[in-house]
């Protein structure tokens, strides 16, 4: 019998997903590249900036849902571009109208244009309103374990701390805070922002994150479709490594083969 820990399902808002890679839809050169990259990623959940993307609110313009049909993908509307709770709540309510009453949203309330750090005070306000309004809230936040705990206590269904600045590609800047969040939070934790290449995604999964969300790392790669496939395998590898359990770190060497019984 294998001693590898068996995996548990990845569940969000009562739905089970096979892929632990979530992807965004921005920054691609056109919708065809968007479609090809997302197909290559194997992602089932696709996040969309409601304020920047036509989901049917602008008749006559290309509709992203024609390329990424909701019967194939779970569309996760997000509040990118919102800088206070009022804007974010309004955007979530618009998304519910556009997506036939679906309540799953990704909340992000930004502090400024330069850093795109989350405004945690406004995020907490918006989260409380949205949860009371019946939304299933996945929330972008800082890597502060106390804020993460408060958001979970409000009723957010997933906590999404940044690993680095949005679009920076800096990788996992503070794995220690992420570890604390993972230990202290009882809802799924997904790394959101900062991933730059496949090894970053693997590290996030090895830490124990339920999943990883990314956009720039794929869309800004020299070959986005190829990078999307790389990220697919990176997330799988990281999850398997987490379940298997890494060997302990040691200060000194340890021979792979025993020294007893050597031929003399």
UniProtKB/Swiss-Prot annotation:
A GO biological-process term: thiamine diphosphate biosynthetic process
Protein name according to UniProt: Thiazole synthase
Primary residence: cytoplasm
EC number: 2.8.1.10
Pathway annotation: Cofactor biosynthesis; thiamine diphosphate biosynthesis
Residues annotated for 1-deoxy-D-xylulose 5-phosphate binding in this entry: 167, 193-194, 215-216
Matches recorded under Pfam families: ThiG (PF05690)
UniProt-recorded Gene Ontology molecular function terms: thiazole synthase activity
Entry's localization field: Cytoplasm
A GO cellular component entry from the record: cytoplasm
Record's function text: Catalyzes the rearrangement of 1-deoxy-D-xylulose 5-phosphate (DXP) to produce the thiazole phosphate moiety of thiamine. Sulfur is provided by the thiocarboxylate moiety of the carrier protein ThiS. In vitro, sulfur can be provided by H(2)S.
InterPro entries xref list: Aldolase_TIM (IPR013785), Thiazole_synthase_ThiG (IPR033983), ThiG (IPR008867)
Family: Belongs to the ThiG family.
CDD domains, per database record: ThiG
Keywords: Cytoplasm, Schiff base, Thiamine biosynthesis, Transferase
Gene: thiG
Catalytic reactions of this protein: [ThiS sulfur-carrier protein]-C-terminal-Gly-aminoethanethioate + 2-iminoacetate + 1-deoxy-D-xylulose 5-phosphate = [ThiS sulfur-carrier protein]-C-terminal Gly-Gly + 2-[(2R,5Z)-2-carboxy-4-methylthiazol-5(2H)-ylidene]ethyl phosphate + 2 H2O + H(+)
Quaternary structure annotation from Swiss-Prot or TrEMBL: Homotetramer. Forms heterodimers with either ThiH or ThiS.
Keyword hit for Cytoplasm: yes
Active-site residues from the entry: 106 (schiff-base intermediate with dxp)
